[in-house]
Amino acid sequence: HGAATIRKMGSIMAEPWYDKEQDFAMLFYVGRETVEFIGYSLFDNDDSGTYRCGKLMANERIEASLPSACAIAKKTLRKILGEMFAPLMNKTWEVGYVGIDMMTFRSAGNTELMVHPCVEMNLRCTMGVVARLYFDRNLTTEQTGEFYITPAADYATLAQLDSQLTAEH
């Protein structure tokens, strides 16, 4: 089956396997003239890589939980995004939200937590942006929570999930 699938798709791509600790993203807004850092998204994915939930917490708390290399990455990414989107700036429209998905991981033989600086770039309003904006508008810096996106087949399933989450939190 594998060879037939490769022939049908026309190519194969291989990537290194990472011993992932945590998924997170740096979130930016590309406006008409500037690139603004709007915050972090700390999130969990399920086994298939689908977004499961976002951690609602202050940017400072998220940044404190990440390796110090992230502060350098934030400055570098803002500069790179500014250069990348420069031809689109100073127009009558804005590019909008950009989320750079990253991860912390451990490499073989190294106990230090490392950062993969760009797993994926999303040129859209991601669930991470929604969670970040929800936190910024509704919670205090001392509060924390989780932001779930869960497809529910029916009201009973949704009510059961609500009961489960209420009991857990």
Language model features with spans:
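Phosphate-binding site of ATP-dependent enzymes
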Residues: G2-T50, G99, M103-C118, T126
